UniProtKB/Swiss-Prot annotation:
InterPro entries: PPIase_dom_sf, PPIase_PpiC, PpiC/parvulin_rotamase, Rhodanese-like_dom, Rhodanese-like_dom_sf. This is Rhodanese-like/PpiC domain-containing protein 12, chloroplastic. Residues 1-81 form a transit peptide. It comes from Arabidopsis thaliana (Mouse-ear cress). The modification N-acetylserine is found at S82. The active site is at C257 (cysteine persulfide intermediate). GO terms for molecular function: peptidyl-prolyl cis-trans isomerase activity. Keywords: Acetylation, Chloroplast, Plastid, Transit peptide.
């Protein structure tokens, strides 16, 4: 017999439940460039303060164990897709795209019914939209891209040990979850200016890599590097909406600014748009001038 050991303090309606989540937990993981982020990413930023843990400093990353979480009283879930090698990567750096649905801890029969519906072929997004009490229901249960340390421990443990497209279950203080990992990626990488300089000596690299400079035109008049296309951060609204017509998400993309801060913002945003291999140039053009080429002016 399945026994409920926790309760959900939220009210029974989804709207009130969402408000209770917000009051219960606090965490600020707001994407700096939310202006043109996809809807599920804009929502994820908001929901991070509701569902994904208390204070990020209080959550210790946990290395997943080999087997999925099991709630006693339910049969094992079957796979909806073939296994991949997703969980064999570095959990510390890995980011996953998570979809889930949530019901209250005492809705055991509904949870079993939803599990059966899923196994019978119904889509997780449809089930989440109709039955989930999580605010993500309006996005089909999509939570967005998350990494270790951003979620409550029970949910994190289940999500980060799940294979791609495998559906697993877990229980948190908010209720019972069916969750699925839809995709995975490595975070934005840093590249030192010395390594960048070495790469730039290779004509093949200069031909194939995407080099973008997010500084303002007046800055670029003072100092610039060859091969970099200009995408000023202050003009984000003009070039961001159709960025994939200007840059290829499949290619290596290197982002430059003065000291590395603005470039990291844009690099993270590019990754959120599906760019697979994004590098932030550490220290920016100022570091390039100091460490590689003193002929580049500093300002």
């Amino acid at each position: 017999m399945f026994r409920v050991t926790g309760t959900l303090s939220a009210a029974s309606s989804p709207a009130v439940a969402a408000a209770s989540f917000s009051a219960a937990l606090r965490l600020s993981i707001t994407p700096t460039l939310a202006i043109a982020s996809p809807p599920h990413l804009r929502w994820f930023s908001k929901f991070s303060r509701q569902f994904l843990g208390g204070r990020i400093s209080s959550l210790r990353p946990r290395i997943p164990s080999p087997c999925p979480i099991r709630l006693s009283g339910f049969p094992a879930l079957k796979m909806r897709a073939s296994f991949s090698s997703g969980s064999s990567g570095s959990s510390a750096s890995r980011e996953i795209l998570v979809q889930h649905l949530l019901v209250k801890n005492n809705d055991v029969e509904l949870f079993a019914e939803l599990q059966k519906k899923f196994l019978d072929g119904e889509e997780m997004s449809d089930l989440a939209a109709e039955y989930s009490i999580c605010p993500s229901k309006k996005d089909g249960g999509i939570l967005g891209w998350v990494k270790l340390g951003q979620m409550v421990p029970e949910f994190e443990e289940a999500a980060f040990k799940a294979e791609l497209n495998q559906v697993v279950r877990c229980r948190t203080q908010f209720g019972l979850h069916l969750l699925q990992v839809l995709s995975e990626r490595e975070p934005v990488k840093d590249i030192q200016v010395e390594e960048l300089h070495s790469k730039m000596q290779d004509p093949v690299f200069m031909d194939e890599a995407q080099l973008i400079d997010v500084r303002e035109p007046n800055e670029i008049e003072i100092a610039s590097l060859p091969g970099f296309k200009v995408f000023p951060l202050r003009q984000f609204g003009t070039w961001a909406p159709d960025i994939t017509s200007k840059l290829n998400p499949e290619k290596d993309t290197f982002v430059l600014c003065k000291v590395g801060g603005r470039s990291m913002q844009v690099a993270n945003w590019l990754q959120s748009q599906g760019f697979k291999s994004v590098y932030n140039i550490t220290g920016g053009i100022q570091a390039y001038s100091l460490k590689v080429d003193p002929s580049i002016p500093t300002y």
